[in-house]
Amino acid sequence: MSWRTVIIESKAKLSYKNDHLVIRAEDVHMVHLSEIAVVLVESTAAVITSYLISELSNWKIPIIFCDTKH
């Protein structure tokens, strides 16, 4: 059941590993894709792998990209 909104507000690398979204910033966080309702990328300094984009699409998880002005 998805319930998390993942918000990326600063420099980070987003990737995929074993059905998890991996967020590498100052430290590393992993969130299982089944828990994610939406990914909101508010930073223009974020990097996201194409494989993660593909997996989010397969799981029907929307990705929203915006800048500081929204």
Named regions from a protein language model:
Residues 1-70:
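N-terminal intrinsically disordered, cationic/polar leader segments
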